[in-house]
């Protein structure tokens, strides 16, 4: 539970904004603001999956339709038929390509690194119990605690024109990370130096425009397969979870009427996820401004917004957290 969201300048750690979270989110949104490590979230979700209904190591190669069902095909020759097939197969979705044809992703010119710093073994007196956003020219760094405060998660994004692979699992090194942030504040450099050398990964950030439709016949998309988004609003996993909840409610409401189910699902989810996609794209431009004049205007805008509404969550992002997926049946 972070105390606040804090914006800092890349070179002198000067404050850009301070948004209280722990003290304000329950009153504003009826819930706490949590940080969770992705692996822990996966483990929690996996607890509710029945092993007898799960097949692993099955590579989907496509989806086709008959009159009343969708049929998924797999690399081993097996097929799977269902009233509804949901492609939740990520940014390189085979199901999306089968439904709508291949769509090449656009490389944004940004590289992202992720790393973990073990706080138990290496105390970090300079790291506050906040979510910290260090904003600099052509890059930014985000830090926040995970694993009950025993580790600090570090996400660093910088401009880089030389990336071509859309992958989350490419290993990197401390030196490569340090080289991407010359002249940054000593606290950031120290974090990079303390990172677990076996846990530093990098990936290129690829973008796609919002889709006009997700569903066709008896198949649809969910999560990154439907709306891959840049990480500048930290909403990728949240949007996928919301998708899943709304789709389940639509199925409960309309039963085997797959047409009405998918119509309700898209009507509820597509406007919201498209807005998040586009706002995340614009947020990246704001974070990575480089000219002195741009930085001055941006920082003045941060301060003005802070004075106007000290309890604002994030930077004009209240609308992200005000949404309540559990009320979706009222809108079907």
Locations of regions flagged by a protein language model:
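A conserved short coil-to-beta-strand element within the FAD-binding core of flavoproteins
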Residues: 56-70
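Conserved FAD/dinucleotide-binding core of flavoprotein oxidoreductases
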Residues: 14-42, 69, 75-80, 116-202
């Amino acid at each position: 539970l972070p105390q606040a969201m804090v914006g800092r300048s890349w070179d002198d750690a000067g404050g850009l904004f301070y948004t209280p979270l722990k003290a304000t989110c329950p009153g504003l949104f009826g819930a706490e603001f949590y940080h969770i490590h992705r692996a822990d979230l996966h483990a929690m979700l996996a607890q509710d999956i029945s092993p007898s209904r799960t097949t692993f190591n099955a590579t989907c190669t496509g989806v086709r339709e008959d009159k009343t069902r969708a049929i998924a095909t797999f690399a081993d020759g097996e097929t799977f038929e269902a009233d509804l097939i949901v492609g939740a197969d990520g940014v390189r979705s085979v199901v999306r390509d089968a439904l709508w044809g291949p769509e090449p992703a656009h490389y944004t010119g940004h590289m992202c690194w992720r790393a973990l710093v073990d706080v138990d073994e290496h105390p970090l007196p300079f790291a506050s119990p906040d979510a910290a956003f260090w904003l600099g020219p052509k890059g930014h760094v985000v830090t926040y605690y995970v694993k009950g405060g025993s580790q600090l998660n570090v996400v660093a994004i910088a401009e880089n024109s030389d990336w071509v692979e859309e992958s989350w699992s490419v290993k990197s090194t401390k030196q490569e990370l340090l080289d991407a942030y010359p002249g940054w504040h000593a606290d950031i450099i120290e974090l990079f130096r303390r990172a677990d050398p076996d846990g530093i990964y990098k990936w290129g950030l690829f973008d796609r425009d919002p889709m006009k439709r997700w569903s066709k016949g008896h198949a649809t998309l969910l999560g990154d397969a439907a709306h891959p988004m840049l990480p500048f609003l930290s909403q990728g996993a949240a949007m996928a979870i919301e998708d899943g909840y709304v789709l389940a409610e639509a199925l409960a409401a309309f039963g085997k009427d797959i047409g009405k189910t998918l119509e309700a699902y898209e009507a509820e989810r597509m406007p919201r996820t498209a807005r998040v996609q586009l706002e995340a794209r614009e947020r990246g431009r704001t974070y990575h401004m480089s000219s002195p004049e741009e930085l001055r205007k941006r920082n003045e805008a941060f301060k003005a917004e802070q004075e106007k509404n000290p309890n604002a969550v994030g930077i004009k992002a209240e609308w992200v957290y005000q949404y309540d997926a559990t009320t979706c049946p009222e809108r079907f």
